Amino acid sequence: GASLVLVGVAALASCPLQAWLLARLRHHGGLPGFTLPFVLIGLLALLCIAPVSVSSPDVPAPDATTLRDAWLLGIGQVVFLHQPLAAACLLAAVALASLRDALWLLAGSAMGLLAAGLFGAPWADGQAGFNPALAALALVQWRGGWRLPLLGMIAAVAIWRVCIELGLPALTLPFLLATWLGLALRAPHPSRVD
């Protein structure tokens, strides 16, 4: 229906925007665009369609299985996976490539899960964990040890909380802003070190 057409138009509109942003950023040595076109077009589309409700659904009782699944889904949501087993497969694939990266994904998802529990926000679907997981994964690629990914996770959680307070859908905005903050403060990328 109409929503499928809107998704198609938004996807097509994001391609030239992404190409333009990436070209400008590379030309000026600036920050990477990451998910900026998705966030801009997604927010515009969501805010134009209807008022967005970011109210919290019922929060399940935190038993071991539900917590484990939410922890995994915080990683799975990075690529829109909604099943814990699929998320575990993604985590295993990342671990095969880099155990360090997999551990940072787990740490980011755990921080989001913990923050959601503290804030009384929904947590079982993994939505609270994917932004800090993404920020940690992006920032661990630069030198500087554990501080930069930790800063990214904390900033992503704080920005996610601000989005909730403002009634905005977070999408990947917390990841984007937190990662930009971390990159603005970073040591040089390993490939740029002489």
Residues of each region from the PLM?
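Membrane-helix interface motif
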Residues: A50-D58
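C-terminal transmembrane helix-loop-helix hairpin of multi-pass membrane proteins
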Residues: G1-L47, A61-A86, R100-D194
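Transmembrane alpha-helical segments in integral membrane proteins
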Residues: A88-R100
